Amino acid sequence: ELCCPMERSS
Protein backbone atom coordinates (compact mmCIF):
# COMPACT_ATOMS: atom_id res chain seq x y z
CA GLU A 1 0.00 0.00 0.00
CA LEU A 2 1.16 3.50 -0.78
CA CYS A 3 1.18 6.37 1.65
CA CYS A 4 -0.70 8.93 -0.43
CA PRO A 5 -3.61 8.86 -2.90
CA MET A 6 -1.55 10.85 -5.41
CA GLU A 7 1.17 8.16 -5.31
CA ARG A 8 -1.17 5.52 -6.72
CA SER A 9 -2.02 5.78 -10.41
CA SER A 10 -4.62 3.02 -10.41
Swiss-Prot record:
Lineage top rank: taxon: Eukaryota
This protein's record includes keyword Disulfide bond: yes
UniProt keywords, alphabetically: Disulfide bond, Hemostasis impairing toxin, Platelet aggregation activating toxin, Secreted, Toxin
Expressed in which tissues: Expressed by the venom gland.
Keyword NADP: no
Self-association state and partner proteins as the record states: Hexamer of heterodimers of subunits alpha and beta (alphabeta)(6); disulfide-linked.
One CC-aspect GO term: extracellular region
Biological source species: Tropidolaemus wagleri
GO molecular function: toxin activity
Annotated protein name in UniProt: Snaclec trowaglerix subunit beta
Similarity field: Belongs to the snaclec family.
UniProt function note: Potently induces platelet aggregation of washed human platelet and platelet-rich plasma in a concentration-dependent manner. It acts by binding to GPVI (GP6), leading to kinases-dependent exposure of functional alpha-IIb/beta-3 and platelet aggregation, and also induces metalloproteinase-dependent GP6 shedding from platelets.
